């Protein structure tokens, strides 16, 4: 297809195309619409509604990630020193998300009641070694303004008052400890995605197409991409100056189709999940927190159990898990050939190397997949001793695709998220999983900063973003006073009183 001399008047041309209708694409769409309102862009989503795959309320493995209670974000190094850098980074990123929501809510643009509820976050451990670890973590983290309000207790009665289902039917002489942060949250990212896109759709320069899938993409000249898309069996071609690939696990397949040099070193490792869910009101009303345990030594990060209070479709539920498993699908609603189609000559050796190095992980995932209902409930009893199998049912969670990256040593399996950018800023892709949705605003700001839109107007656009997220605040994100000011502002707008 030849390029148009005046693409802005061409119905098949868009300044940007965002692939995927989940929290990542919707966050980027919101940012573009707010700071670049004249940009003509298209969002395409394979399913018939936004936020239905990885962003879906039951599909999202963890909500309200702020590193308050997730112990795998504060590991010990080889010398036994506690590392909290990742926890600090995640917490600051989550506060950035909170700041954007506060700005939009204050302006009357979104309704926080549809997606945000405050609820305590608790870390819970048993055994002297784990208690010592938790105490060390508490002491180190409370030195920082992000976690200054954290409480520690090894009192059975006090922990019982925080989370009664954790101590019911537990021997009172058992050595246990917990930390608690009252300013935790439960976020329904599916509902938030719908809020974002409802707002974005008011912009006359934005088009959203559901039941529309990316088939192929290629660079046709220095400034344009051609995308082949399919909607209910009908294929068409569109052109754009910028592409964002935010299609969850399928992003790796699309990134490979782009053939940008930066994509060559990547592969994907899919992980499935299942929840135990309780709807019984006499139990859901007794548990008002998110409680994270500690993974067994040598267990993978996705094995960390948590018992969450969640609000989904205006209903209060308890979710335990997710129990990880192995699959070759990259999305719940995709193909079992996803993994095999992602194997290319430039990543096959790194993927095989990861397979050999992580044989224990693969065996773990397979063993988790083979668990029956009773064995899953027995696992739940480690956190909730009074659990009764008849009160819980099983439901599939979403798919996660962990990053496999080529290294000098072969291949490396990464647990996290990573942005891949083309050298000219015309394409960006988001790979990976946790912490994901909770840090979407910070991640999408980075995506926007590396895009073609920042090439000629970086200073002005950066100011617009800062004014949107941090109005009346101007300082480094790493400055402790700035962090305190952000939390104070957000608490005031949301009506949260510590």
From Swiss-Prot:
Keywords noted in UniProt: FAD, Flavoprotein, Oxidoreductase, Tricarboxylic acid cycle
Record bears the keyword Flavoprotein: yes
Pathway in which the depicted protein is active: Carbohydrate metabolism; tricarboxylic acid cycle; oxaloacetate from (S)-malate (quinone route): step 1/1
Domain of life of the native organism: Bacteria
EC id: 1.1.5.4
Pfam families listed in its UniProt record: Mqo
Entry-linked SUPFAM superfamilies: FAD/NAD(P)-binding domain
Cofactor(s) listed: FAD
GO molecular function: 2-hydroxyglutarate dehydrogenase activity; L-malate dehydrogenase (quinone) activity
InterPro entries for this protein: FAD/NAD-bd_sf, MQO
Catalytic activities: (S)-malate + a quinone = a quinol + oxaloacetate
Any Gene Ontology biological process: tricarboxylic acid cycle
NCBIfam families: mal_quin_oxido, PRK05257.2-1, PRK05257.2-3, PRK05257.3-2
Recorded family membership: Belongs to the MQO family.
Name of the protein: Probable malate:quinone oxidoreductase
Organism: Prochlorococcus marinus (strain MIT 9301)
Lineage of origin: Bacteria, Bacillati, Cyanobacteriota, Cyanophyceae, Synechococcales
């Amino acid at each position: 297809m030849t390029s148009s001399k005046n693409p802005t008047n061409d119905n098949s041309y868009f300044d940007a195309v965002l692939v995927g209708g989940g929290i990542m694409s919707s966050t980027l769409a919101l940012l573009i619409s707010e700071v670049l309102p004249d940009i003509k862009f298209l969002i395409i989503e394979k399913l018939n509604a936004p936020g239905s795959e990885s962003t879906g309320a039951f599909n999202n493995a963890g909500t309200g990630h702020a590193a308050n209670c997730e112990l795998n974000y504060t590991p010990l190094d080889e010398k036994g020193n506690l590392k909290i850098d990742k926890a600090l980074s995640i917490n600051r990123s989550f506060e950035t998300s909170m700041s954007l929501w506060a700005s939009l809510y204050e302006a009357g643009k979104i309704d926080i009641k549809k997606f945000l509820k405050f609820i305590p976050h608790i870390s819970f451990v048993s055994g002297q070694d784990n208690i010592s670890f938790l105490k060390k973590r508490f002491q180190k983290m409370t030195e920082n303004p992000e976690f200054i309000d954290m409480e520690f207790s090894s009192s059975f009665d006090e922990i019982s008052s925080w989370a009664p289902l954790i101590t019911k039917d537990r021997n009172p002489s058992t050595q246990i400890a917990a930390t608690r942060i009252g300013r935790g949250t439960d976020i329904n990212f599916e509902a938030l995605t719908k809020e974002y896109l409802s707002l974005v759709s008011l912009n006359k320069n934005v088009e959203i197409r559901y039941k529309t899938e990316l088939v192929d993409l290629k660079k046709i000249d220095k400034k344009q991409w051609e995308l082949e898309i399919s909607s209910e069996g009908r294929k068409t071609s569109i052109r754009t100056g910028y592409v964002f690939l935010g299609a969850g696990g399928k992003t790796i397949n699309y990134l490979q189709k782009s053939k940008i040099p930066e994509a060559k070193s990547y592969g994907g490792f899919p992980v499935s999940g299942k929840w135990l869910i309780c709807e019984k009101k006499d139990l859901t009303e007794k548990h008002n927190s998110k409680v994270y345990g500690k993974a067994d030594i040598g267990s993978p990060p996705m094995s960390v159990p948590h018992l969450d209070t969640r609000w989904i479709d205006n209903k209060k539920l308890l979710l335990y898990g997710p129990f990880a498993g192995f699959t070759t699908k990259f999305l719940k609603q995709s193909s079992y050939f996803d993994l095999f189609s992602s194997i290319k000559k430039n990543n096959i050796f790194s993927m095989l190397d990861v397979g050999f190095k992580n044989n224990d992980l693969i065996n773990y995932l397979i063993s988790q997949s083979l668990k029956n209902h009773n064995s899953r409930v027995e696992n739940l009893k480690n956190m909730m001793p009074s659990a009764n199998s008849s009160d819980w049912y099983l439901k599939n969670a979403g798919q996660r695709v962990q990053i496999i990256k080529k290294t000098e040593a072969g291949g490396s399996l990464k647990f996290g998220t990573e942005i891949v950018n083309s050298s000219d800023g015309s394409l960006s892709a988001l790979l990976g999983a946790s912490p994901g949705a909770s840090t979407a605003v910070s991640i999408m700001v980075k995506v926007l900063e590396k895009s073609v839109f920042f090439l000629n107007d970086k200073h002005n656009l950066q100011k617009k973003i800062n004014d949107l997220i941090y109005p009346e605040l101007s300082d480094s994100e790493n400055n402790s006073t700035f962090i305190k000011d952000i939390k104070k502002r957000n608490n005031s707008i949301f009506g949260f009183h510590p």
